[in-house]
C-alpha cells in the first residue's frame, strides 16, 4: 500500500472539497445546485451503508455522494475496489467538477460520455444499482412537456409524475434503477410528503409496494440553496426479508451487525 500517495490524495481531496464548499457558500443558490453539505452526505451514507456493489447518483453534482461512499467503505476496512460508481450530471461545468473531484482521489467512475438530462437522455439505461444516493434539485418545475414521457417505462405501475414538479419523477427514476436488493437514500423538500393528485397516488403505491423504510425531517438552514426544511427518504426493495413480529406487531429493520 502506498501510504504516502494515499495521504497526498487525501490532502488534495480535502483542499478541493473545502474550496467547493466555499464556492457554494459564496455563489448562494447557483453554487448550492452542485454542492450538498458534507454532513448531509455523510448521514445518507451512514444510513444506507454502501459497503459493496454498484452505487448510483442520477444528479451527481460535484460528486460528493461518491466521495463519501468511498470514505464509508474504507472506514469499515473495505476498499474502493469493492464498489462501482455510476452517475449523471446535466450542467457541463459541474460535470467537469465531479470528474476532477473523483480523479484527485483516485476514484474510478462512469459519469456518462457527456453531461446530459437524466430524464431525457439516461446515460445508464440498463443499470440496476445496489445503492442510490442523491440530492435532486428541489421542486424542479416544467421538467417535461405535457405530452412528453407519458409512456416512459420508469413510471410502470405508477401514475405519470406531474409536469409542475419533478420530485416524483426523480423518485420513480430511482426506484426503476434499484436492483432487487437495492437501497436508496435521497433528499427532497418537505412538500413532497403532502402533495396531492398524482403525487398522492404514487406515494400510496410506494407504501403498498412496501418500499418506504424511513423518512426523516432534517433541520432547517442546512443548504445554501434554501432555508426550507427537507426530508431524507430511505427506500428499500429488500425490506421484507428483514421483517419480524414482536408482541403481535410487525417491525422492519436492516441488519447492521456486518
Placement of each model-derived feature along the sequence:
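Core catalytic lobe of class I
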Residues: 1, 210-211, 218, 228
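Non-catalytic, mostly N-terminal accessory regions of nucleic-acid modification and defense proteins
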Residues: 1-51, 110-123, 217-220, 242-258
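Conserved S-adenosyl-L-methionine
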Residues: 30-134, 139-149, 154-157, 189-191, ...
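Catalytic-loop motifs flanking and including active-site residues across diverse enzymes
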Residues: 40, 167-170, 229
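Short glycine-dipeptide loop
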Residues: 51, 178-184
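Glycine-rich S-adenosyl-L-methionine
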Residues: 153-178
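Short glycine/serine/proline-enriched coil/turn segments at secondary-structure junctions
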Residues: 194-195, 222-226
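Short hydrophobic/aromatic beta-strand or adjacent loop that forms the aromatic wall/cage
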Residues: 228-232, 257
